[in-house]
Amino acid sequence: MKILIVGAGLVAYGCAYSALQEGYEIYIADHAIEFGLPNVWPSVLLDRQSIPLSFSTDQQFEGVESSFRHEWIMKGMSIELAKLGVKFLHRTRVVSVEELDSNLYQVELTGAGQLNGVHDYNVIINTTQDTWIPWATPHNLSNSSIMYDVERQEAIGYVHLRSQSNEFTNAIYQIDRQDGLSESWYSGNHMTTNRKVIEIISTMLPINHSLWDCSERFQTGMKLWSDRK
């Protein structure tokens, strides 16, 4: 049985991991050249032990304790999932989905990725709400077997020197990274007058702040698959 997951984020990866345990053939499609980049998520990992999939690097680039770089987690997980047989369709957009019967979808794919044209899948999983790619033409997912639905709002993250952390008060998350920098994250249209900000990350994140945590999102993906029946 072939499964297409559209929207490459940690919810998709959790879903893919669970489906792999049941022997399914998994494809993950999205716009990016490398899934996880550019980063639009906080570097928060509160319960690493809850994730059954390895994602560590020998150099520990991804982080330490509860401060783990989201983009490195995605990179490490991509490698592990590929080893397990997941096929990644980078630079790919879903043009159309036609439901032929209850167990078969005909999907047209386009882009500069590995697959183009019309392909058949038994299950379509829409996890695009776990991603934020405003520059890309949206996937046209008129039909899907499973949809990850979450309420989101604007959010903003500041990457700054650790010495400037006291300038960013009332942050939902303030993270001290392994590289010596810090991240401060806020909901809504937050503004700062600090001129020493290194990077500003504008994104859309869940209203439920617990879903900003990488481990929570991976677990949500696993549950999305287990609850499908």
Language model regions located:
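Class I S-adenosyl-L-methionine
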Residues: Y17-L20, S78, A82
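An acidic- and aromatic-residue-enriched active-site/binding cleft used to recognize and process polar
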Residues: A8, H31-E34, R93
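N-terminal Rossmann-like FAD-binding beta1-loop-alpha1 element of flavoenzymes
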Residues: M1-Y27, S210, C214-K229
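A generic structural signal for short
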Residues: L4, E65-S66, T137
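Predominantly flavin-linked oxidoreductase catalytic cores and closely associated redox partners
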Residues: K83-E199, T203-R228
